[in-house]
């Protein structure tokens, strides 16, 4: 009985042993260093950035009161959200004529380019920082011994810094345009029924932009995190060591000459 059960037990233990070895190989103390700690912040705020922008949805609206008694107050509610292709969002404009009831209208504007670029950059930042954390925690010796890894990490960090600045600024401008296009006043201004004397239009639901405003804030926080991390990544590159060697070279030579003079 013992001989038949031993293979099953060893097969059950082998995956656990592999997981234990993997966890034991992780050097969690690296997270206390700036290089690892900032990567954790970059990973978290990348989630906050693309999550707050990509999950946003809001609504705007207006009220139309026809002067004719045959018509009641019409409430218009328009739902919109990411990726903010507002020209594809439809709503029904009531008509105060006796013959017709409503007319299909569309919001104006397409702000998908800055929004999608912002979300895409956040997703790429999420995956890159997660991969970088694995290298820092599990393969840090390879990272320090191989000079290519710090150089690649530095170049990628500088690139992400630039892209986050562009993405946050572009999405901030795009969000301002989205607010202008989805205001209730913009909705009533686009409806022809509100320009005549046969109806009275007033503002309805006002869109709440709190989550969208946070996404812009998270974008600039990501920029500052990546910009600050450039220095710590640069310190791991051979370029930083060369600069120190060049700075210490003349001082060491002058110290040696001074020692020789004192001996004489």
UniProtKB/Swiss-Prot annotation:
Transmembrane segments: 34-54, 117-137, 151-171, 214-234
PROSITE patterns, per database record: MARVEL
GO CC annotation: membrane; synaptic vesicle
Region listing for Disordered, in residue ranges: 242-264
Tissue expression summary: Expressed abundantly in skeletal muscle and at lower levels in the kidney.
Statement: the UniProt record of this protein carries the keyword Membrane: yes
Residues exposed to the Vesicular side: 55-116, 172-213
Domain of life according to the entry: Eukaryota
Keyword line: Glycoprotein, Membrane, Transmembrane, Transmembrane helix
Subcellular location per the Swiss-Prot or TrEMBL entry: Membrane
Family recorded in the similarity comment: Belongs to the synaptophysin/synaptobrevin family.
Function according to Swiss-Prot or TrEMBL: Involved in communication between the T-tubular and junctional sarcoplasmic reticulum (SR) membranes.
Protein's UniProt name: Synaptophysin-like protein 2
Lineage start: Eukaryota, Metazoa, Chordata, Craniata, Vertebrata
């Amino acid at each position: 009985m013992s001989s038949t059960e031993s293979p099953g037990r060893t097969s059950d233990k082998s995956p656990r042993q592999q997981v234990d070895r993997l966890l034991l190989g992780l050097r969690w103390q690296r997270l206390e260093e700036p290089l690892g700690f900032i990567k954790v912040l970059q990973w978290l705020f990348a989630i906050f950035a693309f999550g707050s922008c990509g999950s946003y949805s809001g609504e705007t609206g207006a009220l139309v009161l026809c002067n004719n008694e045959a018509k009641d107050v019409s409430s218009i509610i328009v739902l919109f959200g990411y990726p903010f292709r507002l020209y594809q969002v439809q709503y029904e404009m009531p008509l105060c004529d006796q013959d017709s009831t409503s007319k299909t209208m569309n919001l104006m504007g397409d702000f998908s380019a800055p929004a999608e670029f912002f979300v895409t950059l956040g997703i790429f930042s999420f995956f890159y920082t997660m991969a970088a954390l694995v290298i820092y925690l599990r393969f840090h010796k390879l990272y320090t011994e191989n000079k290519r890894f710090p150089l690649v990490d530095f170049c990628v960090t500088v690139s992400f810094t630039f892209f986050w600045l562009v993405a946050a600024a572009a999405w901030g401008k795009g969000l301002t345009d989205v607010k202008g296009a989805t205001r209730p006043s913009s909705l009533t201004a686009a409806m022809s029924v509100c320009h005549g004397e046969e109806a009275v239009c007033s503002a309805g639901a006002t869109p709440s932009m709190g989550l969208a405003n946070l996404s812009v804030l998270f974008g600039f926080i990501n920029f500052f995190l990546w910009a600050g991390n450039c220095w710590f990544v640069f310190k791991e590159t051979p370029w930083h060591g060369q600069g120190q060697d060049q700075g210490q070279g003349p001082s060491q030579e002058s110290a040696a000459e001074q020692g020789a003079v004192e001996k004489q």
